Amino acid sequence: QMSLYLAEFAKALGFQVLLCDPRQEYAQPATPIERTFAMPDDAVQQFAPDAHSAIVALTHDPKLDDLALMEALRSPAYYVGAIGSKANQAKRRARLAEHFELSQAQLARLHGPVGLNIGARTPSEIALSILAEMTAKRHGLSLTASPFQPKVST
């Protein structure tokens, strides 16, 4: 499952990780990753994100993801992301604005579709792309232009 890959990769890079999914049927086998079965909005509040926190919603279930995102976007977390297509992101932003009264400034902080475009196809590749975006943002890098692309003079 992608959330477990992301959690393991993030832990390897020194992130403190909390995996939240209230659905018992998706419980992972025993791992060294801290886990909670709390509702996502409660988990975000209890986590008390600060400017060094990253929060990513990965369930594809708006009833769960939107709750987490509502709290995350109201927090000082440096990175808030959600999996889903551009069309789903547009619907999500509309729901968050309408039902949770989030401002346009708060909604502008939402990364989605989440992750850098590296052509990821598998859950582990998608997790890697998400962590790459989180890491770039953590280091204050602009994701609009790659520092590795040569400048072309005309």
Q: Which residues does each predicted region cover?
A:
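Residue-level detector of alpha-helix initiation sites
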Residues: 1, 62-63, 87
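Glycine-rich adenosine-cofactor-binding loop
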Residues: 1-21
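Residues in the short beta-alpha loop(s) of Rossmann-like NAD(P)-binding domains
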Residues: 21-23, 86
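Short loop/helix-cap segments at secondary-structure boundaries that form the rim of catalytic
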Residues: 24-33
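Conserved SAM-binding strand-loop segment of SAM-dependent methyltransferases
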Residues: 33-39
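Short amphipathic alpha-helix with an adjacent loop that forms part of the alpha/beta core around
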Residues: 40-51
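ADP-ribose/adenylate-binding Rossmann-like module
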Residues: 54, 70-95
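Adenosine-phosphate binding glycine-rich loop
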Residues: 83-154
